[in-house]
Amino acid sequence: MHVLLISGYTIMSDNEYRKLSEAEIKNELGKLDGWRVVSGKLCRTLQFENFIQAFSFMTKVALEAEKMNHHPEWFNVYNRLDINLVTHDLNGISTYDIKLARTINQLYS
């Protein structure tokens, strides 16, 4: 994989930034604990002990997402966090969404 580093940001090369086929998504879902596809987006719900833990986790994810220049859609109420990943400019789930989902799983484990 070709990776460009620009001021602390990691940006995948163009051949790594692409929309995934249904078969590729299904294959990747088998490797992503807790994720499912809903309305064309990768989705996962996480539970924490309290709001502080949920918000702390969101901050960790935000820092990693910013490095990738790829940001989640999410919704937080108290200890619950709903996360949706989709690449709007490709109109679907992309390699970036899979990479961010893996990062989120690593941070949550």
Please annotate each region the language model reported.
Residues 6:
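Alpha-helical and His/Cys-centered functional microenvironments
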Residues 9-32, 38-48, 52-109:
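Charge-rich, low-complexity N-terminal segments
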